Swiss-Prot record:
Keywords: Amino-acid biosynthesis, Cytoplasm, Histidine biosynthesis, Isomerase. This is 1-(5-phosphoribosyl)-5-[(5-phosphoribosylamino)methylideneamino] imidazole-4-carboxamide isomerase. Its EC number is 5.3.1.16. The active site is at D8, D131.
Length: 246
């Protein structure tokens, strides 16, 4: 199973938000390129970027640093990015820059036609990010809970041709309370495309628990606060995941 380190970008810095609140950000580094290189050197095989300013503005806002990160690690591992991706031109520009995958979140829920077009135009390179609370999809930086059931919506997007689904359990993201294994497995079992777990990874027990259900269709897990605050040693965790996969 892939452990995917997250670099959340705000004003050119690497931060973590607590529960998606822009005004509750912890700055971990003012040199995200160095951070990306660090995770590569620790054995990461994929990198997860979020343009937080972009997510709130609806268009790319950290382009210079994203370009620099891709220049540093883009040849070594696939990089995926979400935040502010609202049109096909933005996707094309990012992929031309060396991004392996784009992640579409709120825009997929609000304008499913855009997601459909993106999957047609860039097959295999579009990941959908679904955030849910108690099984219902949330949008707009978690500000709004919709009446969409996460499994129903994910199945519909699977039919569009998305590469995979990043599933975030909102109750847990950035709160270090453990991954919602049950909800993640339920989603993975309903789909034939891979699910990437996100939100709440806190320690090696969470890694063990996820690896135990990897065969249900869970391809990886995104980790942020835990690897920055030191409750998970990234290299040790990836080694453990590889050993458990046998």
């Amino acid at each position: 199973m892939l452990l995917i380190p997250a670099i959340d970008l705000k004003d050119g810095q690497c931060v973590r938000l607590r529960q998606g609140a822009m005004d509750d950000a912890t700055i971990f580094s003012d040199d995200p390129v160095k951070v990306a290189a660090h995770w590569r050197d620790q054995g990461a095989r994929r990198l997860h970027l979020v343009d937080l300013n972009g997510a709130f503005a609806g268009k790319p806002k950290n382009l210079a640093v994203i370009r620099d990160i891709l220049g540093e690690v883009g040849e070594d591992m696939p990089v995926q990015l979400g935040g502010g991706i609202r049109d096909l031109d933005t996707i094309e520009a990012y992929l031309d820059m060396g991004l392996a995958y784009v992640i579409i979140g709120t825009a997929a829920v609000k304008t499913p036609g855009f997601l459909h077009d993106a999957c047609d135009a860039f097959p295999g390179q579009v990941i959908v990010g679904l955030d849910a609370k108690d099984g219902m999809v949330a949008i707009d930086g978690w500000a709004k809970i919709t009446n969409h059931n996460v499994i129903d919506l994910a199945k519909r997007f699977e039919d569009y041709g998305v590469n995979s689904v990043i599933y975030t359990d909102i109750g847990r993201d950035g709160m270090m309370t453990g991954v919602n294994i049950e909800a993640t497995v339920k989603l993975a079992q309903a789909l034939t495309i891979p699910v990437i777990a996100s939100g709440g990874l806190t320690n090696l027990d969470d890694i063990r628990a996820l690896c135990a259900v990897e065969d249900e269709g869970i391809e990886g897990a995104i980790t942020g606060r835990a690897i920055y605050e030191g409750s998970i040693d990234f290299a040790a965790a990836q080694t453990l995941a590889d050993e458990l996969a046998g």
